[in-house]
Design a protein with these regions (language model features):
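Alpha-helical transmembrane segments
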Residues: 44-69
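N-terminal secretory/membrane targeting signals
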Residues: 1-24
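Non-transmembrane, membrane-proximal soluble domains of secreted or membrane proteins
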Residues: 23-46, 66-293
């Protein structure tokens, strides 16, 4: 009977230990690849350690009081002590000082995250059910980013494909958002249908995409942070909410400029091909044959 019970306990433990097939996870937020993300991380850790020390003090004092002043040791309640001005001043002043100490860096970080002025590149981000649209404002380049074919095939019921064999399962797309490193990029985030949320942890950005409303965010990625970074929609937006990942590919400025030129050339060629049939002259109808007299 005990072996059977241990088996039931082992199942959830193994589930927790096993690597997730559909997502990467961590116990803490990442430091990120921007100055703002590191500021957010620092604020988060400052708050965390303050809470830890408060918990250690409060629970430590409670446990000490319970053990030392327990009834079995002959302790009796003190009915005379009902008020202590000095103690009340201390336990009021300390929380106020803690809140002020947190408010200063929090306000500084909040102001920094909202300052999208002097951006060098503007990208319009639009959420759809269930994909993301990216438009590079002023460059004539736009793209739709959807779940890649391998992940889409593996997620289908009865596909027979083991998700563990798919690289970056449910976290890969056909067309990633390409951005340059060392450049201040401004995002204008909105949605076409329902509320979505554009969330990329390494940038410390999580902004709702709301139909008829534009939210603003910005980032400037470290010059040495060339690579690919992944996020997800963080707002329940319908049936396929879990299947519209966010992938950002960071390139050097030179590589990004070359990529933009390639995309512009491809867009121009596609537009020319689409306009060609409309520009061709209509065929002259054949003359009707003359009637025999």
């Amino acid at each position: 009977m005990m072996t059977k019970n241990l088996g039931w306990l082992a199942t959830p433990l193994l589930t927790l230990i096993a690597p997730a097939a559909h997502a990467e996870w961590a116990l803490n937020m990442p430091k990120g690849i921007t100055d703002v993300s590191r500021s957010v991380y620092g604020l988060h850790m400052l708050t965390f350690w303050i809470c830890v020390w408060i918990a250690v003090f409060v629970f430590g004092w409670m446990i000490y009081s319970i053990v030392v002043f327990r009834h079995s040791k002959g302790a009796v309640p003190d009915t005379k002590l009902v008020h202590n001005t000095k103690a009340e001043i201390i336990w009021t002043t300390i929380p106020v000082l803690i809140l002020i100490g947190l408010a200063v860096p929090a306000t500084k970080t909040l102001i920094e995250t909202d300052d999208a002025s002097n951006s060098q590149l503007t990208i319009r981000v639009t959420g759809y059910q269930w994909k993301w649209g990216y438009e590079y404002v002023g460059s004539g380049v736009s793209l739709l980013s959807t779940l890649d074919e391998k992940s889409n095939a593996a997620r289908q019921l009865g596909s027979g494909i083991d998700p563990f064999t798919v690289e970056h399962y449910l976290l890969n797309v056909d067309h990633p958002l390409v951005v340059p490193a060392g450049t201040k990029v401004r995002l204008l985030i909105t949605a076409q249908d329902v509320i979505h949320s554009w969330w990329l942890p390494v940038l410390a950005i999580k902004k709702d995409a709301i139909p008829g409303f534009v939210n603003e965010a910005w980032f400037k990625i470290d010059a040495g942070a060339i690579g690919t970074y992944r996020g997800q929609c963080a707002e329940l937006c319908g049936r396929d909410h879990g299947f519209m990942p966010i992938v950002v590919e960071v390139k050097s400025k030179d590589d990004f400029d070359a990529w933009i030129k390639t995309q512009q050339a491809a867009s121009a060629a596609a537009a020319a091909a689409a306009a060609a049939p409309a520009a061709a002259p209509a065929a002259t109808p054949a003359a009707a044959p003359a009637k025999a007299s």
